[in-house]
């Protein structure tokens, strides 16, 4: 029995949920999200709650049970409140700029890195070394953040690179003579 999957999802005020077989459409004050689920699960609306139930007893149905419930819960939170991620850029001369629909990163390479900003993600740069990402889709926001971090992941000796704000980087000692 899935500990996550068996919990019902309460639908808050201001959020509308539409069900069509395994397609879930959720709209709220921040926007609209839709997702089609695959697998042996059933999504049922009871009063002001959504319930996800497995249709079979096999391993795939049990795996999708908790996953589908978590994804739907994240969709509801996204359209109601939204998600925010904060990235830090550490290093001399490392900085970020937004030009049009591109994020321009200067990361001590022979060229500047340009990354196209997805349409449903907003970027704010309070400082040159801090990137604030905001969006309603938690999955796409995390994927975009990982694309940015992949350009220059933090290294353990000097701590240079791009990382999540609250992530601790285990530092290593350099060579000794």
UniProtKB/Swiss-Prot annotation:
Cysteine pairs bridged by disulfides in the record:
none
The reply to whether Kinase figures as a keyword in the UniProt entry is no
Q: Which UniProt keywords apply?
A: Ribonucleoprotein, Ribosomal protein, RNA-binding, rRNA-binding
Single GO cellular component annotation? ribosome
An example of a GO molecular function for this protein is: structural constituent of ribosome
> From its record, what is one biological process in GO terms?
cytoplasmic translation
The record ties this protein, via NCBIfam families, to: L6_bact
**What subunit structure does UniProt give?**
Part of the 50S ribosomal subunit.
Family statement drawn from the similarity comment of this UniProt entry: Belongs to the universal ribosomal protein uL6 family.
HAMAP family linked: Ribosomal_uL6_B
Question: What is the role of the protein in this entry?
Answer: This protein binds to the 23S rRNA, and is important in its secondary structure. It is located near the subunit interface in the base of the L7/L12 stalk, and near the tRNA binding site of the peptidyltransferase center.
Recorded protein name is Large ribosomal subunit protein uL6
- Protein species of origin: Rickettsia prowazekii (strain Madrid E)
Species lineage:
Bacteria, Pseudomonadati, Pseudomonadota, Alphaproteobacteria, Rickettsiales
What gene name is listed for this protein? rplF
């Amino acid at each position: 029995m899935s500990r996550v999957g068996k919990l019902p999802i309460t639908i808050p005020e201001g959020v509308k949920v539409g069900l069509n077989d395994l397609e879930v459409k959720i709209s709220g004050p921040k926007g609209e999200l839709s997702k089609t689920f695959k697998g042996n699960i059933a999504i049922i609306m009871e009063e002001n709650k959504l319930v996800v139930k497995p249709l079979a007893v096999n391993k795939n149905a049990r795996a999708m049970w908790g996953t589908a419930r978590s994804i739907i819960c994240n969709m509801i939170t996204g359209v109601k409140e939204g998600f925010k991620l904060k990235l830090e850029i550490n290093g001399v001369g490392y900085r970020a700029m937004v030009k049009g629909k591109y994020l321009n990163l200067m990361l001590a390479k022979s060229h500047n890195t340009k990354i196209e900003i997805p349409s449903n993600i907003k970027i704010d740069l309070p400082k040159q070394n801090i990137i604030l990402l905001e969006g309603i889709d938690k999955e796409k926001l995390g994927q975009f953040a990982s694309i940015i971090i992949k350009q220059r992941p933090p290294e353990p000796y000097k701590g240079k690179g791009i990382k999540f704000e609250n992530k601790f980087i285990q530092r290593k000692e350099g060579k000794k003579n």
